[in-house]
Amino acid sequence: MLKIFTKLFGSKHEKDVKKIKPIVDQINELYGPLQSLSDEAFRNKGTELRKKVRDSLIPIEKNIADTEKKLDNPDLSHEENEQLNDTLDNLRKEYETATASILDEVLPETFALVKETCRRLKGHTYEVMGREMVWDMVPYDVQLIGGVVLHQGKIAEMATGEGKTLVSTLPVFLNALTGRGVHVVTVNEYLAQRDMEWMRPVYEYHGLSTGVILSGLYSHQRRNEYLCDITWGTNSEFGFDYLRDNMAGTVEEMVQRDYYFAIVDEVDSVLIDEARTPLIISGPVPNSDTDTKYREIKPWIEQIVRAQQNLVASLLGEAEKTLKTKPNDFDAGLALLRVKRGQPKNNRLSKMLSQTGVGKLIQSVENEYLKDNASRMHEVDEMLYYAVDEKANTIDLTDKGREFLSKLSHQDQDLFLLPDVGSEVAAIDADANLQPSDKVRKKDEVYRLYAERSDSLHTISQLLKAYTLFAKDDEYVVQDGQVNIVDEFTGRVLAGRRYSDGLHQAIEAKENVKIEGETQTMATITIQNFFRLYKKLAGMTGTAETEASEFFEIYKLDVVVIPTNKPIARNDMDDLVYKTRREKYNAITSKVQELVAKGQPVLVGTASVEVSETLSRMLRAKRIQHNVLNAKQHAREADIVAMAGQKGAVTIATNMAGRGTDIKLGEGIREMGGLFILGSERHESRRIDRQLRGRAGRQGDPGESIFYVSLEDQLMRLFGSERVISVMDRLGHEEGDVIEHSMITKSIERAQKKVEEQNFAIRKRLLEYDDVMNQQREVVYSRRRKALKMDRLTADIMDLLLDYCNTVVKKFHEANDPAGLEEQVMRELMVEFKPDPSAFEREPYEKSAEELFKAASEFYHRKESDLPDDIMRQIEKYAVLSVIDQKWREHLREIDGLREGINLRAYGQKDPLLEYKQEAYKLFVDLLQEIEHETLSLAFKLFPITPEESEAIEARQRQQAINQERLVAQHKEAESAYEVSPNASVDSTMSMPGDEIVVQQPIRAEQKPGRNDPCPCGSGKKYKNCCGTNE
């Protein structure tokens, strides 16, 4: 029915393109006359356009600036402040509307200008990444359509080789005319620098400046790059700079400006594949015993894993023996189900699953035990030492496993069970024989015991995961004594990224490399919430249509499929399905041999480093020359890709998503059928498979693509094999036979859709959790920025003082304790206030509160008059910033702890998300109260220091600046929707972070100390008598 309607009325994408066609016609009309202009007259056109845009926006910008200046007035009443803020909000909305209006007006003329600029650059030679490149590009009509779509804040899906990089110049140029800065986001730094150097001539022709953010740049260099009209960089660099700006100690340390317009290249990779990995700036946890903890427990885990492997081997042997005589035996099926629960990646089990009827038998046994809400699944698991749920990525110790570990560790089995805190605390409260002090002590013991056991069980769980669910050269590689995660979507090593929640340390212990210390979160934001900061967001990719609903639901981004310049001539064949991996690999090598003999180039796509190296060994055995491109050979990437389209070339590459380089065909290859794409297995995401197919058939070139699949592949094993196995069983397939049918291909795509839906649910859930933090982050960062710019600080402190006076007086008035009030006010504000005891009891508390406010404000104003104005403002700024930074870090730690355990609330029939929102709100209310209280106290108590104290503090600050090198920015790899940040305690020494947090090259904290200065090592001696003795 849907197909009939589409035929009658056209698809959504056809309608989208049809609406833009008149704009394209208008661009081409304006393009013609520009060709006859002289260079000078043509350049003047660009200047005129820029002036036209700026002139239309300057009046509103002036109104905004004037309103902001009025808000700086410390004498404003609360009502006046509110009115001005409302006016400012309306002016900003008006500014965005005016910007959109003027840009739409000049769009046809600007796009025509860019097109003519490209024509004039034809034949010119430029250096791009050290290579000479001749400019030969002028936008086609379909590229103009793509440019309009991007300007409208949508996602343009364009096939590989259709010139996405050139398309981006059109909306980037147009939006850069505003002078507000445009950000172009790429998947890696190589592409950021390459695209900047490649497209720079178009922008520089008309005086627009270009910059690129690279990981090794210092703050002042970054600031200069952000001040350019157009700035390229990776999503993580832009995100980390946002976090660092919100940790800055001065306005001068901040590097970014307005978040106006961002175009995200490979938008699906950035906004979907990386959406589960939050950006985290973390610092070391002092006195962490991570290394000892993992090393101590590791031998126990190795023994329990070996015991489970022996048990699994025994169960498999029994099942194999029974199935020879009784093919449908229930007990044999139960044994195999236990093997599946105990060691799901077992090779012998994978081979047995390819036998007729075995998969069906295991499924029927599992269905039997899953009845009545899986009430009998414990009977399956009780024989095992631990049960593995591969789909959920979880491992549970059984009673048998706990008993095994208690014998190994010579400790009570109860040590591997968490105490029921609630019931134990209730029992203590109900015990009438205990004194109040004894109750407090016993409760503390219960909480301590829970924390210790929880920590040990967590370490055991993470080590078990490391040994059973994470394989070397698949999920990670070990290079130079470090465990590096491999991106499952691109096959690249993710430098600097770590698994969260202790899993990375567990893998380091397993691989016998140095175990890095635990970290604490200093600042964090998810990719989703960072990109929501932009007023306008757009993206381009070759594959977005399959995720269109997610793009719209999460980011409110519409997807428009742009037609190709020439029809796609690639032949996409149905999948070939084999029973075992061995059969599949043999078939792949035979096919490669056949293609080499013919001279047709072939690209073999693999899902892991391990598979790429296995196929490489098999091809070497057949003496077939080939190149391998995976996480271990990434340095040769550009050269390998450049040769992949030549005659007889064989290239094995882990997932080609995000490679960013087109494979151009050599001479005579078109006649052979073009590039042959051979996928060695289906990926979890249809999008990644489409990207691999898209490497062939660029710009109307011929090409072929096919996937070879086996029932032992991860996707088939977890989600898709039952239906396919039953089909193969009915057809009576023997070893070595292959099945090829569109029904099988559709079945595999259904399995992929199932996984995509599951992953979307996880990303959506993560966002729902982070939305709670996002609202809190916005409030805290907004207060911090206000303090950094020293906006109305004195007036705010007076507001805090008024609230404080009312709260504290009311508290002591109710208790009739004037002496207590006097003592607390002196301790917290250093203000002498002695209320008359008889009047205090007789009169309403508001009168005493008024008297206290008068006394405290007089004290504060005396302090102001005694100190220079700039010193007083610095004291206020320091009071606000230092308290916010310390309390925010403590709050992040508490939120980490809350998020870690909130899932357990589901066992009590409670919605974990709702519980999380309620608990997080309570924590946030407490945070704001603490910030206000301690800020007020610090502002009153801080005074300038003597020269001698100054010397000692400077020495400490120099040491602290050196300690800053230990802070790292990490794009954290999340295990699941709820495990996205490390569990760490607070390092109170880091109260005022500076700007050089991620250190890619050596940093000098400041100038070398003088000979009579205190030594920066913190010894207290003079530099000449300590570290400077040899100079």
Swiss-Prot record:
It catalyses: ATP + H2O + cellular proteinSide 1 = ADP + phosphate + cellular proteinSide 2. InterPro entries: Helicase_ATP-bd, Helicase_C-like, P-loop_NTPase, SEC_C_motif, SecA, SecA_CS, SecA_DEAD, SecA_motor_DEAD. Its main location: membrane. The lineage of its organism: Bacteria, Pseudomonadati, Chlorobiota, Chlorobiia, Chlorobiales. Monomer and homodimer. Part of the essential Sec protein translocation apparatus which comprises SecA, SecYEG and auxiliary proteins SecDF. Other proteins may also be involved. Its EC number is 7.4.2.8. It is found in: Cell inner membrane; Cytoplasm. PANTHER family: CHLOROPLAST PROTEIN-TRANSPORTING ATPASE, SECA INNER MEMBRANE COMPONENT OF SEC PROTEIN SECRETION SYSTEM. Belongs to the SecA family. May bind 1 zinc ion per subunit. This is Protein translocase subunit SecA.
